[in-house]
A protein has these predicted regions:
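Hydrophobic faces of well-ordered beta-strands that scaffold small-molecule active sites
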Residues: 19-21, 88-90, 129-132, 158-160, ...
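Catalytic metal-binding/acid-base residues of hydrolase active sites
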Residues: 24, 163, 199-200, 249, ...
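Active-site gating/metal-coordination segments in enzymes
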Residues: 86-225
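A general structural motif
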Residues: 223-225, 265-268, 287-291
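Aromatic-lined glycan-binding groove of carbohydrate-active enzymes
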Residues: 230-278
Length: 356
């Protein structure tokens, strides 16, 4: 593969198209939309409190150093070639969720994000698919935004965080919230993929040192959000829902035995139809768990047909060599190929021009 070709070669898998399902872009138009908006400075102050000054001082230069990789299509293609990746499913940086925005501004945010990602896909239609955004803080607008991403912009689905502040200071929107039922139903009806990618954590200052706001919070938020989906019965009511959890689903998949035990012994946890661990086979997870042993444990917990390749490129907490890291796990060749691209293809995440 070259950095400028519009074709794919099957990467390094002998014919399997290698698909990175977890890769980010910054959509400049989104930042133009929110610039100067009421509420932006308050949100930045909250982010500073959550991340801590030390981490915030690192984040700015880190983003600046990666800005071309986040915004320049030619550089992105070069990165993909170096990594042995044929296809990226590109999603906006989670920093562009802007869940603080009111309904009117939120509509401008998702329209800009969805069209920005669609422009990347349209520029190289054999190399990219994409996820758009929806305003999780406004449950009544989710279906409209989902339709915008999938039906109007032609994207594969949307990216959401693990929770959002409630509209107008109301109750927090968890993924178990009944107000999300129309969204889950519509996503299942469309066959749209929902990428669960946490951003932020409600523990705030407890994690404001040592970058715990990311290293601990991201996997914790994944575990909490997935638990809300499981225990509330969302997956019972919407069995066709296609949800991919970033970061390997965090802490939940390899420690779900405790959830099973609670389901068996406590009536307040016996709220879903089956053992919580059984729902791992109704979800999908990316491979970004950072060690070969952790990836093997994830595959043992959920099955290789429930794992997709993910890099979190080009951020510093991501990896530039997702295929090499997959190979380092020493999986069965068939399982390895499923993770490299076969599972993603089954989810409909190949570019539309490559789908049979």
């Amino acid at each position: 593969m070259s950095g400028t070709t519009s074709g794919t070669t099957g990467g390094t898998t002998g014919g399997t198209v290698v698909v990175d399902v977890h890769a980010h872009a910054i959509v400049p138009e989104v930042e133009m939309v929110v610039a100067g908006a009421a509420g932006l400075e308050a949100q930045r102050a909250l982010d500073l409190r959550r991340y801590g000054r030390e981490s915030a001082a690192v984040n700015g230069p880190m983003i600046a150093a990666r800005m071309r990789r986040l915004t320049d299509l030619g550089v992105r293609l070069e990165d993909m070639a170096a990594a042995g990746v044929d296809v990226q499913v590109v999603s906006p940086s989670p920093s562009q969720y802007h869940y603080w925005a009111d309904a009117d501004l939120a509509r401008h945010v998702w329209r800009a994000a969805n069209r920005g990602i669609a422009a990347i896909v349209d520029a190289e239609p054999l190399r990219f698919n994409g996820f758009g955004l929806v305003p999780l803080q406004h449950p009544d607008l989710l279906v409209e935004a989902l339709d915008d991403a999938v039906e109007l912009c032609g994207l594969a689905g949307v990216e959401i965080s693990s929770y959002a502040p409630g509209p107008d200071g109301g109750r927090t929107v968890e993924l178990s919230d009944p107000r999300l039922e129309p969204f889950w139903a519509r996503a299942a009806e469309l066959g749209a993929v929902v990428l669960l990618h946490p951003f932020g954590c409600s523990l705030d200052e407890r994690l404001d040192r040592f970058y715990l706001s990311n290293t601990v919070a991201q996997p914790a938020e994944n575990a909490v959000a997935l638990s809300h989906l499981i225990f509330s019965g969302v997956l019972d009511r919407h069995p066709r829902l296609r949800l991919v959890a970033a970061h390997g689903g965090g802490y939940l998949p390899t420690y779900i035995g405790r959830s099973d035990h609670a389901w068996e012994v406590r009536p307040d946890a016996h709220t879903c139809a089956e053992l919580p661990s059984s729902y791992l086979r109704r979800l999908w997870f990316d491979s970004l768990v950072h060690t070969p042993a952790a990836l093997r444990a994830l595959v043992a917990a959920v099955g290789a047909d429930r794992v997709v390749l993910g890099s979190d490129a080009p951020f510093d907490m991501g990896v530039d060599d997702p295929v090499a890291r997959l190979d380092a796990a020493g999986l069965d060749p068939a399982d390895r190929d499923r993770i490299a691209g076969g599972t993603a293809a089954g989810l409909g995440l190949l570019p539309r021009k490559l789908q049979s």
